Amino acid sequence: MDTKGLILNTAYNDFILGSNISNYLYKNHTKEVYNELTFTNSSYYFYDDEINIWCDDDGKINTIRCASSCLYQGVELIGLPFQELLSTIHILPNNHERIYLLVNGRGQNQHVYDFETIGLQVWVWRQKIKTVLIYKVVEET
């Protein structure tokens, strides 16, 4: 897949949600494994794309995290005022919460907005987008 940027509920650049991480390990990356009580999570950082990829136990990509750049339909989302995103996607978030983070040793109350119908989570501080997470929406049967 030769795309650039975010395709909602599908991909970022050539990283496709649901595909196996082994398809991308030729790219310059680092890997970390987090062993939690109930699950193990593998996280990869890809230097050239400047993204984090989180995978299921079987190596399938479940989440893509963009914090330095995230193009959507030619618009840079990182740094974009949140209201402009709402005007662009024409969807309101399903959920909102405030999460306290330490960033460079200083505290930030970031607003986290979930757009569950399109597989998007947006972290906002001072009304500007700081981080975008992309995930595949799984239809419940």
Residue ranges and their predicted role:
Residues 1-141:
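Short helix/turn-capping signatures at newly exposed starts of structured segments
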